[in-house]
Amino acid sequence: MARRLFLLLLAVTAGLSLTGTTVRAVGINWGTEASHPLPPSKVVELLKSNGIVKVKLFDADPKVLRALSGSNIGVTIGIQNSMLKSLNASVKVAESWVHDNVTRYFNGGNRVRIEYVAVGEEPFLQSYGNQYKPFVIGAAMNIQNALVKANLANEVKVVVPSSFDSFLSESGRPSSGHFRADLNKTMIELLSFLTKHHSPFFVTISPFLSFHQNKNISLDFSLFKETAKAHKDGRKTYRNSFDLSYDTLVSALFTIGFSEVDIVVSKIGWPTDGAENATSLTAEAFFKGLIVHLEKKTASLPRPPVETYIESLLDEDQRNLSAGNFERHWGVFTFDGQAKYNFSFNHKNQVNAQNVQYLPPKWCVVNNNKDLSNASARALEACAVADCTSILPGGSCSGIRWPGNVSYAFNSLYQQNDHSAESCNFGGLGLITTVDPSEDNCRFSIQLDTSHSSSQTPNFFQSWPLLLLFLLSGLF
């Protein structure tokens, strides 16, 4: 063990001269899983006005890429997991994808500064099993070959975002870090590919999930508080959760022979709703601590990430909830581009999205003059298809009582369906009002008025776990 620790120390110390001691850039993830997404042109204005110089996308939406043209923002475009099998099977499919989603944006004066193609979105997530893993390396190779054929391989690098659970240490000590046993062979293949083509290793670091899943990780330790109890590993002392996870990854890379690969933290964040300690105050404390920590020269990070991408720009009311109700609340900004807390990318004041177009100031609430014996059942129906995560335990609206929480559910469906009168019927129990029913910190939102509105109900099978939670928690 002592020899292994010594070799690991040599490896990370050697990296000091290769990567420097400060983070090169902080970017942000821009997801679009929203029923009423903020128009891409508004989002690009938001990025530029807040000094955000890099953005990571989860797909290659033409509307988004057109909005980014000429912005000089560094862009990572994503390939969804559902495409991996076909990309692995056919070079022609990969060439077609590169032509449609990369090459066309390099032509003309308003080009998009595409820097990376991310093959898959955390395809090694443990809950996926072998659903995507067999196709990842082949898909990445075919995309790489397609970029070579298009004469773009020197400008655009191929990467594969790895999940927070792809590496671990059963003992909790970073020096014992390793990749999951079922991933070892795949990781060696992936890292060999990345090293050959001078591409970085993209990976999620999640102090928030570490805090929620590990009773030995305190909130203060997660938020970079100086008062946090330190964790020791041999002679090394860890004073925050980020360093603990990051060095576990460094050790895992060293263990399989890739200690010098550049690391990009492709996702790191703290949600503001949907779970205990998921608040604007804790998110602000986390990000301020993170940025200060990444910017300062510190011996605790001898090989800092070359880039870091915050999760995420905006809240998204259509995100899958399998990981938790907080999934729809990662945004630094609300769904309509309004800052949730004081945090700056460029050491200046935050700038909100400007001239946002909303639906008229109307809400749907429960009609207290009706027989409400069936109101709870109607609220459950609404929450099966609309976003009600804020009224679940730990949410920002969990404190409002019945029938206020019923009104919240009614309004969520009403807003999602663009104020259609039918969506506020609920068997005669709904009432459309122009009086804002918001209570204290519980905001009854008005949706965006945008031509990009989907006005559709989410897949019920995506929402049924939330419905089950409502039934079990007895909120209604």
Swiss-Prot record:
Q: Which reaction does it catalyse?
A: Hydrolysis of (1->3)-beta-D-glucosidic linkages in (1->3)-beta-D-glucans
Species this chain originates from? Arabidopsis thaliana
Cellular-component GO terms for this entry = extracellular region; plasma membrane; side of membrane
How is this protein situated with respect to the membrane?
Lipid-anchor; GPI-anchor
Q: Where is the signal peptide?
A: 1-25
Q: Which residues are glycosylated?
A: N88, N101, N184, N216, N277, N320, N342, N374, N405
Q: Spell out the protein name for this chain.
A: Glucan endo-1,3-beta-glucosidase 9
Lipid anchor positions (GPI-anchor amidated serine): S453
Cited Pfam families: Glyco_hydro_17 (PF00332), X8 (PF07983)
Biological process GO annotation list?
carbohydrate metabolic process; cell wall organization; defense response
Q: Give UniProt keywords alphabetically.
A: Cell membrane, Cell wall, Cell wall biogenesis/degradation, Disulfide bond, Glycoprotein, Glycosidase, GPI-anchor, Hydrolase, Lipoprotein, Membrane, Plant defense, Secreted, Signal
Principal place of residence? secreted
E.C. code: 3.2.1.39
What's this protein's family per the entry? Belongs to the glycosyl hydrolase 17 family.
Location of this chain's protein in the cell: Secreted, Cell wall; Cell membrane
Q: How is it modified after translation?
A: Contains two additional disulfide bonds.
